[in-house]
Amino acid sequence: MHRLRAAEHPRPDYVLLHISDTHLIGGDRRLYGAVDADDRLGELLEQLNQSGLRPDAIVFTGDLADKGEPAAYRKLRGLVEPFAAQLGAELVWVMGNHDDRAELRKFLLDEAPSMAPLDRVCMIDGLRIIVLDTSVPGHHHGEIRASQLGWLAEELATPAPDGTILALHHPPIPSVLDMAVTVELRDQAALGRVLRGTDVRAILAGHLHYSTNATFVGIPVSVASATCYTQDLTVAAGGTRGRDGAQGCNLVHVYPDTVVHSVIPLGGGETVGTFVSPGQARRKIAESGIFIEPSRRDSLFKHPPMVLTSSAPRSPVD
C-alpha cells in the first residue's frame, strides 16, 4: 500500500489556447498560390476539438487575414466562433501587420470601423489579458505609440488578482532569422520600461512563423508557430524560406506560481508504445498513492463571461 501524497503541482487555474498567423484570404484561393490556409486552420481546430481540451479562452495573436479582406474575416469568424462556443471558450483577437483595423473591428468584433489602435483589457475571473496593438498601417514592422504605452502603464498600475498575460503580435525578442530585423518591433526598450516590475506573468506573440521562447525584462515570452505556413530554421545562414509544414499552436496552463507553454503540432502520428486512456491513467495514479489537488477555480464552476474593456478612443494619428 502506497502512502498517499499530493502531486508537486495542482491543476492549473486557467487554460488558454494560443493560435497565431492564420493568414486567411477571401474566396477559395491558396495563400501565395501554395497553401490552403483555410484547410490548415480547419484541421487544427478539428484536432483540438477531438482532444477534449476545454480552454477558458482562445487567444489569436494577429495576422488573422493575409490582406485584411472582409471575406477573410467572415470566413475566420465562421470557422472559429462555433468551435469556441462548443468548447465554452472566450475569444481574444489581436491585430497583426497583415490585418486591417477597420475591417477587423467591423467583421470580427461587430464594432464601428476605426483606424485607432486595437488595445483592450479582457478579464477572465481574476486573470487579466491585455491586448496591445503593435501594427503600423501600411507597414510590416511593429511600433507602440507613446499614448499606447501611457494607457498600458495606467492599466498595469493596479495588479490583477491572478496576474496579467500580455498579448501582442510583434514579439519583443530577437529572431534567429536575419531578415526579421526588417519587420521587428521597434523601440522595445520603451515597452520594457513600462513592463518592468508589473504583474505581467507572460507575453504571448506571433509574427515569426515558428515557435520560440525567450525572456523580456525578466518576463517569459512565448511565440506560437503559424497555422498557415512556417519558416524553415535550417535554411542557409542569412536566408529565409517559408514551408508548408510544422504548423501548430500553443497550449498555455496558468498555475498559481508559473505559466507553462506547450507546443501542439498540426497532425497526429503513429502510436508508439501502449495507448493509455484517461480512465486508465486515473487508476494508475490512484494506485500509486498520488492525488492531484484541484485548482482554485473548480472545473465545474460556471465562470462569468469575459469582461472586455477597450482603451480610450484615440486619433489615428495620435
From Swiss-Prot:
EC code(s) of this entry? 3.1.4.16, 3.1.4.17
A single GO molecular function term of this UniProt record: 2',3'-cyclic-nucleotide 2'-phosphodiesterase activity
Modulation of this protein's activity: Ca(2+) acts as an activator of the enzymatic activity and is able to promote the hydrolysis of substrates even in the absence of transition-metal ions, thus providing an effective strategy for the regulation of the enzymatic activity. Two Ca(2+) ions bind at a site different from the dinuclear transition-metal-ion binding site. Activity is enhanced by magnesium or manganese. Activity decreases in the presence of orthovanadate and phosphotyrosine.
A cellular component term from Gene Ontology for this protein is: cytoplasm
Residues annotated for Mn(2+) binding in this entry: D63, N97, H169, H207
| Ligand binding (Fe cation) | D21, H23, D63, H209
Cite the InterPro entries for this sequence: Calcineurin-like_PHP_ApaH, CNP_phosphodiesterase-III, GpdQ/CpdA-like, Metallo-depent_PP-like
Give the enzyme's main class according to its UniProt record, as a single word: hydrolase
Activity at various pH: Optimum pH is 8.5-9.5.
Task: Give the start-end ranges of region C-terminal extension.
Answer: 278-318
The cross-references to PANTHER family, in alphabetical order and at most eight, read: CYCLIC NUCLEOTIDE PHOSPHODIESTERASE CBUA0032-RELATED, PHOSPHOHYDROLASE
Q: Which UniProt keywords apply?
A: cAMP, Cell membrane, Cell wall, cGMP, Cytoplasm, Hydrolase, Iron, Manganese, Membrane, Metal-binding, Nucleotide-binding, Phosphoprotein, Secreted
Q: Domain description from the entry?
A: The C-terminal extension (CTE) is used to better adjust the substrates into the active sites and mediates in vivo subcellular localization of the protein. It also modulates expression levels of Rv0805 in mycobacteria.
| PTM | Phosphorylated on Thr-309 by the eukaryotic-type serine/threonine-protein kinases PknA, PknB and PknL. Phosphorylation does not affect the enzymatic activity, but it renders negative charge to the protein, promoting its localization on cell wall.
Instruction: Detail which positions bind AMP.
Output: H23, D63, N97, H98, H209
Protein name, per record: cAMP/cGMP dual specificity phosphodiesterase Rv0805
Lineage of the source organism?
Bacteria, Bacillati, Actinomycetota, Actinomycetes, Mycobacteriales
Q: What is the effect of changing H140A?
A: No change in activity
Q: What does this protein do?
A: Cyclic nucleotide phosphodiesterase with a dual-specificity for the second messengers cAMP and cGMP. Can use 2',3'-cAMP, 2',3'-cGMP, 3',5'-cAMP, 3',5'-cGMP and 3',5'-cUMP. Hydrolysis of 2',3'-cAMP produces a mixture of 3'-AMP (major product) and 2'-AMP (minor product). In vitro, is 150-fold more active in hydrolyzing 2',3'-cAMP than 3',5'-cAMP. Can also hydrolyze the model substrates p-nitrophenyl phosphate (pNPP), bis-(p-nitrophenyl phosphate) (bis(pNPP)) and p-nitrophenyl phenylphosphonate (pNPPP). Overexpression elicits a transcriptional response that is independent of the phosphodiesterase activity. It does not alter the levels of cAMP-CRP regulated genes, even though cAMP levels are reduced in cells.
Q: What is its main location?
A: cytoplasm
